[in-house]
Amino acid sequence: RNGEVTRLIKRCNDFGAGGVSVAIGELADGLMIDLDKVPKKYDGLDGTELAISESQERMAVVLAPEDVDAFLAAANRENLEATVVAEVTAEPRLRMTWKGVTIVDLSREFLNSNGAEKHTTASVPDDDVKPYEFAGDTVTEKLADMLGNLNICSKQGLSERFDSTIGAATVLMPFGGKYQLTPNQTMVAKLPVLHGTTDTVSGMAYGMHPEILSQSPYEGSYLAVIESVTKLVCAGFDYKQAYLTFQEYFERMGTDPTRWGKPFAALLGALDAQLDLNIAAIGGKDSMSGTFEKMDVPPTLCSFAIAPGKASEVISPEFKEAGHAIRLVSCDPHDTAALTANYDAVLSAIRAGKVVSAWALGLGGVAEGLFKMGIGNQIGTRIDDDYDGNLFAQQIGAMLLECTEDIDLGVKVGDTVPEWVLEYEGERIDLTAMQEIYEGKLDKVFSYRGHTGETTEKFSYSAETYPVPA
């Protein structure tokens, strides 16, 4: 945060896998690296180990020669170890010396070629995605089955094992409403500033549906991107300012064309979504060795969408008040023109104050959205008699809106009511029992609720007896 120091840095790179050879080797076309000057935790490492050993918590920076002393002095004031280990050279070659001997001498042209070409065969099946069906003959039975699904039930006990308040910049806490039970779909925090205040925030949301990815890696990856972006829009962010990053896991490839076909299809689906939305992925993390003996991970691509915004324009997903209209805005997620038009319309309504909460639909469809939006403030829903949509249909890219006025956007689903109930087709469902299913599914694994009658075991670190040798 010292501007005088940061302006000295021409280029920098973080250390990680590959160590010196990657972190420093990527900084310039021509480099002379003295491995004897590289700080090490212990002696005995040879030149190869010094060059390629993974190292963390280190950074390589490029400085002008006349700025080196000033930078070293600044590092010393912060109790940081800084060492000159390399020089940028005019000749485009990567050279490394160890004990006075040049042990690496490679042309940059060769390094940039990524070595010899590699070819493989990928077989991509024409997969059909079957819609997920929740068990039950009645709305009550389907709602109970849906809320007990591991991909839908409460993860609050797990979430609360992590501190969401570090830096005191959190805008949206993980769970909203006066009961703090509505899960926020977007992580929003102010950017850190040393002086004054700021309204600028960053928003991040994820998208992933394993039940779709297992059937069709292409469709699952495409919809992962759509879902992550839709969540940002529902929090008040402009999708046109978003960027993406992906996390991927796949089984070990080997030489099996069908195994190669899974990441091929997944990345193709994610690429098509980027091209359709005109949003780029600027980074990612992948693992192509998700196999242990005969066990394979399912094909997995998780999309994270990140965008800048203003705290004053951010909304949270919990229902705010009874008597508000609930509207559903949806379309085919592959109809890019309709989808982006929906994004723009919803964002405009949010910024105009006409939409006070919004939810990006997922596996549980409208029913999941109504329940999770309502649980934070225990505000229920009365569904209109003329609403004929499927409450439990998965609709990626669709948005459920709480409106302060009955705006002309999408279709009207119903209205919020002060009782914690769901009224649908003459049936009045008490959601308190459903809440127990939702919260109790993982309570034994990730407990976060106090239970009546429990006693806390007393722990003492004062020894009353001391063991002695026999």
Which sequence ranges carry the predicted segments?
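Glycine/proline-enriched, intrinsically flexible loops and inter-domain linkers
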Residues: 1-470
